[in-house]
Amino acid sequence: MATGTDFFDQATIVVRAGNGGNGAATFRREKYVPRGGPNGGDGGRGGHVYLIADPEYNTLLHFRYQRKFVAENGGHGGKNAMHGRNGADVYVPVPPGTVVRATINGVTYTVDLARPGQRLLAARGGRGGLGNIHFTTPTRQAPRLAELGEPGQELTLELELKMLADVGLVGFPNAGKSTLLSVISAARPKIAAYPFTTLTPNLGIVEVGVQRFVVADIPGLIEGAHAGVGLGHDFLRHIERTRLLIHIIDAAGVDGRTPWDDYEQINTELRLYQPELAQRKQVVALNKADLPAAQANLPILRERLPVAPEDLFVISAATRAGIEPLLQRVAELLRADPPPQRDPVDPDEPPLEWPLPPVDENAFTVEREGDAFRVRGVKIERLIAMSNLEQDEAIDRIQRVLEASGINEALMAAGVQDGDVVRIGRAELVWDDSGQHAL
């Protein structure tokens, strides 16, 4: 039985990884050891958020009902050097063929989840904070210093499903694509006599004997679509992964256009958008043959269209005339061009990650920010995020790092003055002439 399905091909979701657990500042009870000696354990890692290509899904419809995915926070460290529990990871299923985009530090990155089982580490869980057991020194035997957990990553993801249909129906608006799909499958697309009735693809499963294939009624195309006019790119991006195109032409010219010009214009738009699309195998269906105007145009179309006779069909989607030979030819061409096999990913294969450029974690920048100064750098901002700014020992640690890393020197070179505000991450420090900072 032929079947149809709704199609939901774009979605925006938010993924938030878990925060790392806090390190513990605890002490064991032992005679002659100051405060019993530190024994605070480390916090656990926050849970990651993964996207996984799941062949059980063929649209992004499930994101209409849930758009935010949050992983578990890591557990806090405990006494006796007990390590906090790692937060549970979250796996978000998407259909194979989903393209994922995220903007990180002002740059947009793209990952393609094409193969079943492929995973993307979409949001990384925060590191657990170190317990006070790590901060003993010869001069500080009983530190109360412990780190906070690192915040988990939070990103907004743009998802786009590049359709995996076998056959795409292309043509001008109102050429009869939706009517044809409703005839050859159980899909029930919206059909009406005005342009852009189809705003999103409709999928239908077609059976020819024992052979089954997926046909997509793709939004209608107009002149300038390659530049985004009309539904433009929303039309063209859907056909990139189809193996075969059925090019439907209104042979009667009901909308006042000439059918042979329609044929040329569609192929021009395909070529301008992506040259290889114009080379993709097509069969041409001259539709609306039940109308007298179509019958008058057929001899001209047969003469003018550069289409082999075996790939040119006269049909009427309204009366179903000529449909069967068309489908037989489509099935034959698909058998001759089987889809590439996408083997499932080995479960032990590491997940994909955002293709971020290498970063020097020790690097930093100092710049004016209004009347204040802003310090940016991976390592120093992480230190601020994982420090309890109400602890004197944490502030002392920050001061030592600012001095040792050269940030203090860079601030003085930038012209910092007594009383100026210095912002690092969430912290606002005030410069004094001795080179020290205070909250």
Curated annotation (Swiss-Prot):
Residues 337-359 are annotated as: Disordered. The keyword Secreted does not apply. CDD domains: Obg (cd01898). Residues 356-433 form the OCT domain. It is found in: Cytoplasm. Mg(2+) binds at residues 178, 198. Signal peptide: none annotated. Its main location: cytoplasm. Keywords: Cytoplasm, GTP-binding, Hydrolase, Magnesium, Metal-binding, Nucleotide-binding. Its EC number is 3.6.5.-. It holds the Pfam family GTP1_OBG. The keyword Electron transport does not apply. One of its GO terms (biological process) is ribosome biogenesis. Monomer. This is GTPase Obg. It comes from Chloroflexus aggregans (strain MD-66 / DSM 9485).
